[in-house]
């Protein structure tokens, strides 16, 4: 297989794992296991928390000691076994601690898969979006596979579907671990000035422009959790009224839009308008989506607005990883990717998980959620982020690819 095909399969499996459980875990925990809002918030905060801690270890190892593809293989194989076991767990305490361990295994692979792709692509600005889109396809495939399984097992609806979402994620993870041994050999870079690559990555924040980028990325990432954490309960609420069987498939509308935006629009917009303007457009798509959620009707418009996630995610987060790759010195690119992962999927999502939960509780009276109030909050904050980008962020020239 060609390098691009192998990288595409890598992205497909990487995000099929996450896409199997992330969109619908909240509904499973609340409706079937009886977890309360705080407990669900804690479970959702674990991957961001792990992303604060573990990517720098993974990035350091891949930058200085072991080949990236072998690191990913080991982490995914062990992680898959954990997921299969977690799918059978029903009590909160056991699930929480096992999820802590699993998330510590999965989190480093988010940055490492990006790094492998960037290093093995000749023109990352042009080709990365086409490779990364296979991750979105994997996320969609996982959602439809889960919906298909649940439709075929419709007779079990009364007693719930159990941990099927976590079991499916475990199967994808084991397959990813096996496949990772076939990835392009990506050894550590030789000759780095410092043996501590992650320290050098942190020093990039001495650049005021990069510091602005990191801070705003963090704030935007906090608002991402309003989508990940609250969309499935919102769609299953009386206000929208979708069934648990249909929600996984309906939510893939967002990823279908991602495919179009990532594969077709992102390379064109970067070339024509530059990364800075693409990032601003990405932030501006967020308040539009959230204001539609806040209005909450008609139902078809709320469902259609899921497609805006394609612009929200690709034009900001995917473009952000490309930006970091263009400015990071070659010998610390793994750790630089870990730094943006830390700021967004890590501390940003971690704070966002609790913030979204707190906002939901604030706007809940006698068990009834005021969804309008909930979604106005991220709408306002993302408008502020877009204005800050326009005022304070300037695009820089890239480093030499190597």
Per-segment meaning from a language model:
Residues 53-90:
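Conserved MFS/SLC helix-loop-helix module at the cytosolic interface between two early adjacent transmembrane helices
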Residues 12, 82-86, 92-112, 116, ...:
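Hydrophobic core of transmembrane alpha-helices in multi-pass small-molecule transporters
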Residues 1-48, 209-250, 317:
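Helix-loop boundary and gating motifs at the non-cytosolic
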Residues 53-67, 150-154, 261-274, 360-361:
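Helix-to-loop junctions at the C-terminal end of transmembrane segments
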Residues 1, 183-216, 237:
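Juxtamembrane intracellular "pre-TM" segments in multi-pass secondary transporters
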Residues 148-171, 358-382:
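A membrane-interface helix-boundary motif in multi-pass transporters
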Residues 6, 86-87, 173-184, 374-402:
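Multi-pass alpha-helical transporter architecture, strongest
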Residues 70-84, 277-292:
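Structural signature of the two symmetry-related core transmembrane helices
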